[in-house]
């Protein structure tokens, strides 16, 4: 037993020799190249002054601290809230929301805090699980109350922002009741915070702004102002620019429930603007571009007086002066622009609101002049770089609405400017200005169609598709027409609507050479290829529109061929290969038209649907057929 007894400290005392003795001992009796085995190097802490204390071992790595681990007494690592939030988010991203809810409810109480519950509530709202999100909110209130915590402002903000994403409130009436309840709970939360700390960061009106957006989507305009007048006039809970912006946006969402139009909303917006100026002077907040743009949109659908007031806001805050003349494009708008009367730099959403004001007030010339003024503005005040595709398409629609000579030429210049601007911009933002099918369709099917301008239509077709219409002209025919291979998204395939417009423009130009050029182009593309679905998930509406324009194109082709046959002259007689091409086209379009007529002549079978009789309450059968 003495052998297994605990040895004393003196037994294992090691006398460390001096450095010179260690060196001699290491070289004697050891072959060359061999190493002496030794224990790992450790350093003792200098803090252990008492000889009875055990020295604290420090590892070599200065980045490792074993005492920094959040461990229990038994050595288990505790679950931290941020790790739990990451796990919950990963489950929700994978569609396992119910599993995430079960994980949170079964997690340790130390890992459950308000931000973790907010994370899961937001994930449920993103997945449109609105009922589950509200149940989590009520459950969180009970669980947090037991531990001395309560939902914070971020909780109410998360709930309101998620509910404001609902578009059809008629099918979510229960969620509207929940929104009212959440707003009342938030106001109680604000009152409790103000009693303890009047300067707390929890005092924010962001949830109220989201609640006002919900009220505007439902059309409860009177309730919006009830909320507005219930707020403080001064302090952190006074109306600010975020809340007032939400109020203007709510007035422009739905018409007034009593009158059924936006005239009363515009008058209310004018009153609200005066309240905005008073609140700005009282609370010292700055009026920004979002606030002014929202006010302009709310005023744009009102009376002429309200619209004139909106144009005054455009001039005061953005420096765009409405033109004086009404007969054409006013060059004075550009000269007035140099006065620098703007106080807010123009942004894309602000310019979109201004163009919407011009459209709603039926003043398309104002939109054209404002666009020209923005092209000459410096970038520091909102120059050409803020213009995107939607702005240009709005100007193209303004060109359609006014009777300006050579509007198709001006429209083509706009599209060419878009393509040049796309090259200048970085690739990350270049797509916002790139013309799409809608842009080219406005130019060809509407603007060029009104003027029957074949030259501009052919140039626009080249820019859109990558073809060269020059290869289909008389005397310039190519057996293999050129097709430019450009980067992805720039070549747009021709559709039946575009080709039908091209055929109508050629016929309207009363030029036989243009008609022949259009027929060669259509024959090369092929009418049958236009009837094929563009993708497997093509909607029924898109399919019906495609067949409609194919039928319209077929009628245009027949009309063009008849013109060429009926009015030919000895000097303008069709060639043999053109005659073969037209015969092929005529046979193809007649087959398409006969097929369409057969579909329209189809008589559907009569189906029966039970209809309840109001007299005796018994269900009877009533014959229903498609109206002729």
Specify the residue positions occupied by each region the protein language model found.
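A basic, Ser/Thr-enriched alpha-helical scaffold prevalent
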Residues: 2-628
């Amino acid at each position: 037993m003495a052998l297994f007894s605990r040895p004393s400290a003196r037994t294992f005392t090691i006398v460390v020799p001096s450095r010179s003795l260690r060196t001699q001992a290491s070289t004697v009796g050891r072959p060359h190249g061999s190493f002496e085995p030794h224990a790992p190097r450790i350093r003792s802490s200098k803090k252990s002054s008492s000889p009875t204390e055990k020295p604290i071992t420090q590892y070599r790595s200065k980045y490792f601290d074993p005492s920094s681990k959040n461990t229990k007494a038994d050595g288990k690592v505790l679950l931290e809230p941020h790790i739990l939030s990451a796990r919950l988010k990963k489950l929700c991203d994978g569609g396992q929301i119910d599993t995430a809810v079960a994980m949170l409810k079964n997690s340790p109480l130390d890992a459950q805090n308000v931000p973790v519950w907010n994370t899961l509530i937001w994930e449920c709202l993103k997945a449109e699980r609105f009922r589950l999100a509200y149940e989590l909110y009520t459950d969180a209130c009970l669980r947090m109350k037991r531990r001395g915590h309560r939902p914070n402002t971020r909780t109410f903000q998360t709930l309101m922002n998620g509910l404001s994403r609902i578009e059809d409130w008629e099918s979510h009436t229960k969620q509207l009741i929940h929104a009212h309840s959440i707003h009342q709970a938030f106001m109680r939360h604000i009152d409790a915070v103000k009693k303890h700390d009047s300067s707390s960061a929890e005092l924010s009106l962001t949830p109220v702004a989201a609640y006002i957006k919900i009220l505007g989507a439902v059309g409860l305009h009177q309730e919006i102002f009830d909320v507005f007048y219930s707020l403080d006039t001064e302090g952190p809970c006074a109306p600010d620019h975020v809340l007032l912006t939400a109020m203007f946006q709510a007035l422009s969402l739905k018409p007034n429930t009593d009158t059924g139009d936006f005239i009363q909303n515009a008058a209310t917006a004018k009153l609200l603007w005066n309240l905005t100026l008073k609140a700005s002077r009282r609370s010292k907040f700055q009026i920004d571009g979002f606030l002014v743009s929202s006010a302009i949109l709310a005023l744009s659908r009102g009376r002429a007086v309200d619209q004139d007031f909106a144009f005054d806001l455009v001039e005061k805050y953005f420096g765009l002066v409405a033109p004086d003349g009404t007969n054409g494009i006013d060059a004075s708008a550009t000269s007035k622009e140099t006065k620098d009367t703007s106080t807010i730099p123009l942004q894309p959403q602000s310019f979109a609101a201004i163009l919407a004001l011009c459209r709603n007030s039926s003043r398309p010339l104002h939109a054209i002049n404002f666009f020209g003024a923005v092209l000459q503005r410096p970038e520091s005040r909102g120059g050409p770089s803020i213009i995107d595709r939607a702005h240009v398409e709005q100007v193209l629609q303004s060109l359609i609405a006014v009777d300006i000579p050579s509007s198709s030429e001006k429209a083509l210049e706009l599209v060419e400017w878009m393509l040049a601007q796309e090259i200048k911009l970085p690739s990350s933002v270049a797509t916002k200005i790139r013309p799409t099918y809608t842009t080219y369709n406005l130019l060809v099917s509407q603007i060029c169609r009104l003027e029957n301008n074949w030259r501009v239509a052919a140039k626009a077709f080249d820019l859109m598709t990558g073809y060269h219409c020059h290869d289909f002209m008389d005397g310039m025919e190519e057996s293999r027409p050129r097709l430019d291979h450009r980067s992805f998204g720039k070549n747009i395939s021709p559709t039946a609507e575009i080709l039908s417009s091209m055929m109508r423009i050629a016929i309207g130009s009363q030029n036989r050479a243009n008609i022949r050029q259009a027929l060669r182009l259509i024959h090369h593309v092929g009418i049958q290829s236009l009837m094929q679905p563009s993708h497997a998930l093509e909607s029924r509406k898109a399919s019906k529109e495609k067949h409609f324009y194919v039928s319209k194109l077929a009628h245009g082709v027949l009309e063009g061929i008849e013109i060429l046959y009926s009015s030919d002259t000895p000097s303008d007689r069709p060639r043999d290969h053109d005659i073969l091409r037209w015969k092929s086209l005529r046979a193809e379009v007649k087959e398409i038209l006969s097929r369409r007529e057969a579909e329209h002549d189809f008589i559907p079978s009569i189906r029966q649907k039970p209809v309840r009789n109001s007299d005796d309450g018994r269900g009877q059968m009533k014959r229903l057929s498609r109206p002729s």
